[in-house]
Amino acid sequence: MTQSNPNEQNVELNRTSLYWGLLLIXVLAVLFSNYFFN
């Protein structure tokens, strides 16, 4: 993990993809909870 090359775009892309993944997991968790509670 050398910081000789500033990959700010890659870090920002990974961060946004991580946030989208967490949002998707949350949405799926809500959908599954509603499906199981019905």
From Swiss-Prot:
Its main location: plastid. Signal peptide: none annotated. One of its GO terms (cellular component) is photosystem II reaction center. It is a single-pass membrane protein. InterPro entries: PSII_PsbL, PSII_PsbL_sf. The keyword Transferase does not apply. The chain crosses the membrane at residues 17-37. Keywords: Chloroplast, Membrane, Photosynthesis, Photosystem II, Plastid, Reaction center, Thylakoid, Transmembrane, Transmembrane helix. One of its GO terms (biological process) is photosynthesis. It is found in: Plastid, Chloroplast thylakoid membrane. It comes from the Eukaryota. Belongs to the PsbL family. One of the components of the core complex of photosystem II (PSII). PSII is a light-driven water:plastoquinone oxidoreductase that uses light energy to abstract electrons from H(2)O, generating O(2) and a proton gradient subsequently used for ATP formation. It consists of a core antenna complex that captures photons, and an electron transfer chain that converts photonic excitation into a charge separation. This subunit is found at the monomer-monomer interface and is required for correct PSII assembly and/or dimerization. PSII is composed of 1 copy each of membrane proteins PsbA, PsbB, PsbC, PsbD, PsbE, PsbF, PsbH, PsbI, PsbJ, PsbK, PsbL, PsbM, PsbT, PsbX, PsbY, PsbZ, Psb30/Ycf12, at least 3 peripheral proteins of the oxygen-evolving complex and a large number of cofactors. It forms dimeric complexes. This is Photosystem II reaction center protein L. The gene is psbL.
